[in-house]
Amino acid sequence: MTRSLRRDLYAACAAALLVTAAVLVGRHIQDTRHTLFVHWPPLFADWDPHLGPGTPAALAVAAAVVAYGPAVAARLPWRGLLAAAWASALAWIVSLALVDGWRRGIAGRLTTRNEYLRVIGRFHDIPAALRDFTHHIVSGTPDPWPAHIAGHPPAATLTFVLLDRIGLRGGGWAGMWCITVGATGCVAVLIALRALAGEALARRAAPFLVLAPAAVWQGASADGYFAAVAAWSLALLALAVTRRSHGCAAASGLLFGLTCYLSYGLTLFALIGAAVVVLARGGLRERPALVLSLLAGLAVFPVVFTLAGFDWWHAYHLLVTRYYQGVGGTRPYGYWVWANLACTAVITGPATAAGLRRTTTALLPGSGPRRLPETALALLVTAALLALLIADLSGMSKAETERIWLPFALWLLPACALLPRPRPWLAAQAVLALLLNHLLLTGW
């Protein structure tokens, strides 16, 4: 065993110890103080060993990706790889969701009391609903919004309102929308990686993006949909600055503007966007007008929502009040500030822990000869990690971060491209995801 491999294993073991500590300390706090408001800390889940109709498919997808994923990713034509990655990610997410059954795993996820579909009827007049949106954020106001609606800007809810308007009504359609769009997130990351760090590393990352344990929570979670929108904004930004494309710049700005109106916390994606610009700054030097196209696209959604009567900043301040009115004001910051990182270790898996060790090595001076592709990938991953840490320190995400931080987790997974001999690491990722899905009943 080489020294480098031993260090990779140490990193994976450190992540496992962090998760173990979060479980043991969390159980003690919950049993003695009852302040965590989760049944299986640090995850928002219940212990419920079970099998389901998705079990055979999940095992088959996992076995296929572990056995053939690296070789197929290396040989397929680029566009074929993108299509295969999306199809495989979709199959993995759906099969894991169906372990819980169609109703419990997909169709019922977005219809519970705190979810978006419960308020569709209150948006029969969309302009009026937007003008009145901030009046129902704080608890104690007339007809306060359920937690997820109050906790997000209105574009999140409007997505499902518009699906309903075009005839795609109910939890089944909403769940499959989130899964289908969410599965494209890995494609966006691959496109960005190829533009910034080269095709070889993108191909090595592909199986890990497909077989991520995060898929357990991507199944019918709106945050999986948010993650994909944010990822495409970065992919288009990478194409804009490397290809000097005004169209891609405008589209990137448009999607980042939408991202900010899907989730307040995803404004932190600006940090990852800054890393993209730094890595391809030559494109902006040659065509500084790309900034104007980016800003023009970025302005669209803020202008539309502001003119419609929704004040983003005012809504965010009201959300902070609402957050501390509820369990967010009771959950102990001293536990969650590190237990949230344990949740991230769970959804990204042991391979990512080992990969993050290698990204650190790639950035440290004096750690060996610099390779530009590896350094570019490491900078991108580090920017995502920094954004996640800022979100953690803010205290606005205490618990449920295995779902809430899916958008950031998606950009940590490329670190796995730096690992040699990918199959054992892929197997570890798959086993973790299968155990999580079959031993726990996850919720949000």
Model regions and ranges:
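Specific aromatic-rich, kink-prone transmembrane helix
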Residues: 188, 226-244, 248, 411, ...
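Perimembrane helix-loop-helix junctions
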Residues: 234-250, 267-296, 365
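Transmembrane-helix motifs of polytopic, lipid-linked glycan transferases
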Residues: 63-71, 173-196, 230
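Start-transfer (signal-anchor) and selected internal transmembrane alpha helices
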Residues: 1-18, 43-112, 292-294
